[in-house]
């Protein structure tokens, strides 16, 4: 009989924790969501995005090995703009990392950054950030989002949906025995687990147990090498 604490027991994803909700029908936003389970949380949760650019940024952030938690649309912050006027700004994401640092993330198209002189505005926002809100402020435009890296991050998020601890441990043992670079196919064949091993190797790359070029599509033919510091 399936227990409610079994891994196979279905649980609907937790709702978004966004501080701002966008209307389902809007000419200004294209609302979507990403299912994610961060190290800080026990269950999968919806992370809302107002644009494809935000969704891509979300996926790339979730793929960071040192990420602890990710919040979308956190509470707005007040600042004095370059004209001396009091204004508020709501960041798109607030990321918490395992070293306890916090990074506020603004996502904007490069053209809008230029037309709004947003980099100067962001400096004013950074200057007036409330104590403890964030240690750093970053701006993400399409220049920072490599399309192949985004696709790899999306595949990683998909592979994380179904945990496979046995495959992860077997692949981890194989990695410990590696002394030189090789293909993912070689690791998969050595494991005898087929697609399960491919998914485990993929996860191991983003756990920084293996090095690989994430700006190339990760396939069975991809070259990987062991990371000595993670063995």
At which residue positions do the language-model features occur?
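Electrostatic, structured charged patches in enzyme active sites and in nucleic-acid/phosphate-binding
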Residues: 1-231
């Amino acid at each position: 009989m399936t227990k409610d604490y079994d891994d196979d027991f279905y649980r609907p994803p937790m709702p978004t924790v966004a501080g701002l909700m966008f209307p389902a029908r809007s000419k200004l936003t294209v609302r979507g969501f990403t299912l994610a389970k961060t190290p800080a949380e026990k269950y999968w949760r919806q992370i809302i995005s107002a644009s494809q650019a935000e969704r891509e940024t979300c996926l790339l952030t979730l793929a960071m090995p040192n990420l602890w938690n990710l919040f979308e649309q956190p509470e707005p912050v007040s600042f004095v703009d370059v004209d001396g006027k009091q204004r508020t700004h709501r960041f798109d994401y607030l990321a918490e990392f395992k070293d306890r640092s916090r990074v506020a993330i603004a996502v904007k198209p490069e053209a809008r950054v230029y037309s709004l002189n947003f980099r100067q505005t962001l400096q004013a926002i950074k200057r007036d950030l409330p104590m403890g809100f964030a240690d750093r402020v970053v701006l993400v435009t399409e220049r920072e989002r490599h399309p192949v890296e985004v696709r790899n991050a999306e595949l990683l998020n998909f592979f994380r949906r179904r945990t496979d601890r046995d495959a992860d441990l077997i692949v981890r043992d194989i990695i410990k025995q590696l002394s030189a670079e090789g293909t993912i196919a070689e690791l998969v064949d050595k494991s005898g687990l087929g697609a399960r091993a491919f998914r485990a190797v993929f996860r191991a790359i983003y756990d920084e147990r293996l090095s690989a070029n994430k700006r190339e599509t990760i396939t069975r033919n991809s070259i990987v090498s062991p990371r000595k510091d993670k063995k």
